[in-house]
Amino acid sequence: MASQIAQLLEKALHFWNAVPQPLQYTFAALGALYVLRGALSFVRLLLNSFILSGPNLRKYGKKGTWAVVTGASDGLGKEFASQLASKGFNLVLVSRTQSKLDALAKELRLKWSGLETKVLAMDFSQDNDEDYERLAKLIAGLDVGILINNVGQSHSIPVSFLDTEKTELQSIVTINCLGTLKTTKVVAPILAARKKGLILTMGSFAGTMPTPYLATYSGSKAFLQHWSSSLASELAPHGVDVQFVISYLVTTAMSKVRRTSLLIPGPKQFVKAALGKIGLDSNENFPNTYTPWWSHNVFKWIIDSTVGNTSAFTIWQNRKMHVDIRNRALRKAAREAKKQ
């Protein structure tokens, strides 16, 4: 084996020596540039993940400025609301359940003296224009500086597109896409008029890599990626920062993951990173996009730098993983049905 390798190396060296010297220099330069690009990408990863911080949120408004948070009653939305309140922002909380919104608003007002809150119960899946009109009236005259587009829905369990219920398919697209766009359409003019503001939209690994058995959800997040990067360019002259946040799993009701780990943070950890890493672009394919949680960023960099996040191998692995998750979910449901 060793002798065969030595022979191959000898043949390669002989071939290289036969190449004209100008071409050797050209190939060597291209190779050096490729290695340099990889090294710079790795340095950027380390700086953005462990050393650099984003701007102070005061960039978007003084104490008492308002922040609009959608999907605010649970999970990441609830944590965004809590951490923005801790930084002196008043809150407009938008979600489906009135009782949860009222409870959260009361909890935060008791915790943070002087905090003002407004709540709006609306079901984004209904795509009711009257709801967006109510939102516009609610925030009219407020000094809104931040919009957190957090509302979203995934599939209840991984499922093939052919077996996806029509109602689930429609709900995912309506909430994730139309809900985000229509909310932004209401809030963005206020941010542009005041010449400063932040629009932060939640993305997903599923939007950066095609994800079989979550096809509709994956497509909705990919749509938001392109929309967000386009919107960022449009609103930059108005002083509005538009940022798209990439995340892997976080312990939320939507992810159905209960335990934190090295790769899976809790909402508090993730939101702290998301608000602290604004503007630190870590996705070289799309500007104004960042992956705030360090292990998510490292994981994504490894995939991007090796097999590629849209390669056939990555899609195959994604399919295999989600078929397994589906099968385990179905077995669990069958066991619970027997108990009843």
UniProtKB/Swiss-Prot annotation:
GO terms for molecular function: ketoreductase activity; very-long-chain 3-oxoacyl-CoA reductase activity. CDD domains: 17beta-HSD1_like_SDR_c. NADP(+) binds at V68, R109, D123, D131, N150, K185, Y217, K221, V250, T252. It comes from Podospora anserina (strain S / ATCC MYA-4624 / DSM 980 / FGSC 10383). It is found in: Endoplasmic reticulum membrane. It is a single-pass membrane protein. The keyword Lyase does not apply. This is Very-long-chain 3-oxoacyl-CoA reductase. The active site is at Y217, K221.
